[in-house]
Amino acid sequence: MGKLIDKTIDNSYANELKKQCPSSDMASVTVNIDPETSMVFDNQYYKNLVVHKGLFQSDSVLLNDDSTRKFVEDFANDQELFFESWDQSFMKLTSVGVKTGDEGEIRRICGATNA
C-alpha cells in the first residue's frame, strides 16, 4: 500500500516530494523545508504555504483558519514584517532560560527523557 498524500498539497510539489523520498521508511532521507531559497533566511516558506507547497501539514493547516491565515499571508507578502516579528519572537525566546534540575532537563536525545 502506498503512502497517503495530503490532498491539500500542490500536485507538482507532492510529485517532487515523492521523487525525493523513497517508498521505504528510511530515516536518513531529508528534503529542504524551503526548496526555493533553502540557504537564505527569508519569507519564502510563507510564500510556499500560500500556494499549498508547505512541507509540514502542521504549517499548512494555518491556512484553514482566518486568524492564522492572515499571519501567513502577511508574512508572505511583507518580508520586513516577517523579519520584525521573527526578531521580536527570538528576543522573547532568549529570555526564557534553560530549566534544569527538578524543573527540567537538557535531553541528550530529543525524543526521549534522560534515564
What function would you assign to each model-found segment?
Residues M1-A115:
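Catalytic cores of secreted/periplasmic or lumenal enzymes
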